[in-house]
A protein has these predicted regions:
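N-terminal signal peptide c-region/cleavage motif recognized by signal peptidases
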Residues: 15-18
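Short acidic-glycine-tyrosine-enriched beta hairpin
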Residues: 47-49, 72, 78-95
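Histidine-centered catalytic micro-motifs
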Residues: 55-61, 96
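Short, low-complexity, Pro/Ser/Thr/Gly-rich segments in the mature regions of secreted, periplasmic
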Residues: 119-127
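Short, conserved beta-strand element in jelly-roll/cupin
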Residues: 47-48, 60-74
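A short glycine-rich, His/Asp/Glu-containing loop-to-beta-strand
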Residues: 23-55, 113
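Ligand-binding loop in jelly-roll beta-barrel domains
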Residues: 95-119
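Positively charged n-region of N-terminal signal peptides that target proteins for export
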Residues: 1-5, 10
Length: 127
């Protein structure tokens, strides 16, 4: 019985650690438009602290971004890792698992535009 309890506690700790990593991103919505039909176009500032990560996640629509400050490692499933710096832009197709990690000792900040299915959340955690 003790073994099962310890195992359950270990799995719970891992799940909480994974959740904490996924909440490393702070999104500040700037504008939300109900356009085109059935979609929301959301413009937001996304920030990850130095040494932090957004956590693996997806969006129910395309994401286009522009790096405002800092550097980041962009990890998109099925693609080689990319290092982006202020002034660089990127695109991520709908439903593709990705993560962004602040590179170096500075926080990173991006301007993101998301065109997403309005019946779904802006972002969902991915395994």
């Amino acid at each position: 019985m003790l073994k099962k309890t310890l195992l359950a506690l270990a799995f719970t700790s891992l799940a909480l650690a994974a959740f904490a990593q996924q909440t490393g991103i702070k999104r500040t919505p700037l504008q939300k438009l109900e356009f085109p039909d059935g979609y929301n176009t959301v413009t937001a500032i996304a920030e990850v602290p130095a040494g932090g990560a957004a956590g693996r996640h997806t969006h129910p629509g395309v994401e286009t971004g522009y790096v405002l400050e800092g550097e980041l490692n962009l990890l998109i499933d099925g693609q080689p890792e990319k290092t982006l710096k202020a002034g660089d832009s990127y695109q991520i197709p709908a439903g593709v698992v990705h993560d962004a990690k602040a590179h170096g000792d500075k926080a990173m900040k991006v301007l993101g535009v998301y065109i997403v299915d309005k019946t779904k959340p802006l972002a969902s955690p991915a395994p």
